[in-house]
């Protein structure tokens, strides 16, 4: 019987996840199907329960349900506990396992696809919301020289930094006066077509500016290019986090490069 998987979100029609997982399944010969399900804002838990009762084997979770999925899971992986959010669920005899593959996906895209080593590099993480929290531990595991979290509300960045051990600190945008090797935009500003108030000097020589958003050019990427930085959007992260979820579910690791290339074509 074909195993069922799905991604749950609100909105969800724009999701590329069904296309990505269909490509992974073809590539690896897995008998599975994957769909996008619009969950009501007040009905996420019920939607997941219904899907599992109908034989669903696992699910991805996107905005705005990742924190709710964290609370729903019976068991959590260590990286999900650190992230405080869940983007991958697996249903088994012991209940619901919650995982978070976002940070692993980001690091895989940066170090693998983009060939940007992070060890001994200075990294600036812009934003202090859920998207930022989900990637901090995997970034710190790469042993950067320093990870700086910058946010409009400095206290939020400080509270976030206190949750983790390592070479990291928090500051406001006005305190950014030194160059970085990698600048990651984890804010929702790009969704609104806005630019975080970054000073141009954050982009060091040969710096990479990375926007977690994908699908269109953003003011952040245009600003970074105008100040000499290399740029990348979050499409590779999307595919890499999907590959990590696929591996959790199926025990097979797909080749992401052809899938990323097909989505960019």
Swiss-Prot record:
The record's Pfam families line, in alphabetical order, gives: SDH_C (PF18317), Shikimate_DH (PF01488), Shikimate_dh_N (PF08501)
Residues at which NADP(+) binds: 127-131, 151-156, 212, 234
Biological processes annotated in GO: amino acid biosynthetic process; aromatic amino acid family biosynthetic process; chorismate biosynthetic process; shikimate metabolic process
Alphabetically sorted, this entry's keywords are:
Amino-acid biosynthesis, Aromatic amino acid biosynthesis, NADP, Oxidoreductase
The record's GO CC annotations read:
cytosol
Catalytic activity reported? shikimate + NADP(+) = 3-dehydroshikimate + NADPH + H(+)
Q: Which SUPFAM superfamilies match?
A: Aminoacid dehydrogenase-like, N-terminal domain, NAD(P)-binding Rossmann-fold domains
Organism name: Thiobacillus denitrificans (strain ATCC 25259 / T1)
Q: Which residues form the active site?
A: 66 (proton acceptor)
- Superkingdom of source: Bacteria
Show the CDD domains listed in the entry. Answer: NAD_bind_Shikimate_DH
State if rRNA-binding is listed as a keyword. no
Under the subunit heading, UniProt states: Homodimer.
User: Gene3D superfamilies recorded for this chain?
Assistant: Leucine Dehydrogenase, chain A, domain 1, NAD(P)-binding Rossmann-like Domain
Q: What is this protein called?
A: Shikimate dehydrogenase (NADP(+))
Family to which the UniProt record says this protein belongs: Belongs to the shikimate dehydrogenase family.
Q: Which residues are listed for shikimate binding in this entry? A: 15-17, 62, 87, 102, 214
Quote one Gene Ontology molecular function term. NADP binding
Known function: Involved in the biosynthesis of the chorismate, which leads to the biosynthesis of aromatic amino acids. Catalyzes the reversible NADPH linked reduction of 3-dehydroshikimate (DHSA) to yield shikimate (SA).
Involved pathway(s)? Metabolic intermediate biosynthesis; chorismate biosynthesis; chorismate from D-erythrose 4-phosphate and phosphoenolpyruvate: step 4/7
**Record EC number:** 1.1.1.25
